[in-house]
Design a protein with these regions (language model features):
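Conserved N-terminal segment of class I S-adenosyl-L-methionine
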Residues: 1-156, 165-171, 238, 259-274, ...
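Short catalytic micro-motifs in class I SAM-dependent methyltransferases
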Residues: 156-163, 185
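Short, conserved SAM-binding segment of the class I
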Residues: 167-172, 221, 225
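Short glycine-dipeptide loop
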Residues: 176-182
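Short, glycine-/aromatic-enriched active-site segment of Class I SAM-dependent methyltransferases
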Residues: 185-215, 220-225, 250-251
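A SAM-dependent methyltransferase catalytic signature shared across enzymes that methylate proteins
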Residues: 219-239, 274-275
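Conserved catalytic loop of SAM-dependent methyltransferase domains
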Residues: 234-265
Length: 306
């Protein structure tokens, strides 16, 4: 990026600084409608990071942990597919940023025609080894168009990693059939429990990690983001509020070894309810959603005719 291009980018993003970590500011960008770091990484820097470093060095234990969590993930994904099947008019699904491919696997087991796009070569190999279709590379509508159109497109834990979330979701939207569904899942950052811990209980904003996350959505900004892209909102929900462990005194930030234990307890709680009492799980989720708390949020939207 030359100096002129950098100046144009800086002038395009403006808003109050809401956090500063590792020489990066997070601004509540009035142009974009969501929080993001400033300055942004270049596209080349991101490609290098996610094609190799992300799984090979930054998250070398990723696949081992994913396999350990697989049963829990498949229960969550059953919940997601039941929601999609209540609204979808067809069963062709594209998962952008498909990671280890468990969402694809869950869909294929239910008779969906599924395809993933994934920037990590290692994750693609891991997915293909189980007989699932995945394209290696950063998603573009041009590359995906030969496989489309799609009835559902999933963007799960992706928007926080990309330079241009608006451009990405506009490209995804162009591949949806009229009335198609966009599923958006992202970390619920700067949520009320996090803000209490930061502003009142002496914690730093630990969720701000500029090397991994460029953008910081919460439930409300995620909903606005989808509405601004001309999606009719069909459903929103949040997930288990992991920050409740911190408020209860289990400081997994200062003691990382507690983190896996807390995660295991979350899995046990959710798995029992997803498997045996999904109505009760939905009731808990509705309460968390109403308060804007929960570690992740989900927005499901329908594309209009235009």
């Amino acid at each position: 990026m030359n100096i002129a291009e950098r100046l144009r980018e800086v002038s395009a993003h403006y808003g109050p600084v809401v956090a500063s970590v590792d020489s990066f500011d997070v601004i509540d960008c009035q142009a974009c409608g969501f929080r993001h770091i400033d300055p942004l990484f270049s596209e080349d820097e991101l490609r290098k990071f996610y094609d190799g470093e992300f799984y090979e060095s930054e998250r070398s234990d990723y696949f081992a942990k994913a396999e350990e969590d697989k049963e829990w993930w498949m229960l969550r994904y059953r919940h997601y597919y039941e929601m999609l099947e209540a609204h979808a008019r067809g069963r062709r699904l594209l998962d952008i940023g498909s990671g280890p491919g468990y969402f694809l696997e869950a869909g294929a087991s239910r008779g969906w025609d599924v395809l993933g796009f994934e920037p990590s070569r290692m994750a693609c190999e891991y997915t293909r080894a189980r007989g699932l279709r995945v394209e290696h590379g950063f998603f573009t509508a041009r590359d995906a168009r030969a496989h489309g159109p799609f009835d559902v497109i999933s963007l799960s834990m992706v928007l926080e990693h990309v330079r241009d979330p608006i451009g990405l979701i506009e490209e995804a939207r162009s591949l949806l059939v009229p009335g198609g569904l966009q599923l958006l899942i992202s970390p619920n950052d700067f949520n009320p429990l996090q803000m209490t811990l930061w502003k009142s209980l002496g914690f730093k904003p630990w969720w701000v990690n500029p090397k991994h996350h460029l953008n910081y959505f919460d439930l409300e900004s995620g909903r606005r983001f989808m509405t601004a892209r001309r999606f009719e909102i069909l459903h929103t929900e949040t997930s288990f509020p992991l920050e409740s462990f911190l408020i209860a005194g289990r400081n997994y930030i200062a003691q990382p070894e507690l983190g896996r234990a807390c995660h295991q307890e979350r899995k046990t709680f959710e798995s029992a309810l997803f498997a045996h009492d999904p109505a009760q799980m939905r009731a808990f989720t509705a309460q968390w959603t109403a308060q804007g708390i929960g570690r992740e949020f989900l927005v499901l939207g329908r594309k209009g005719q235009s």
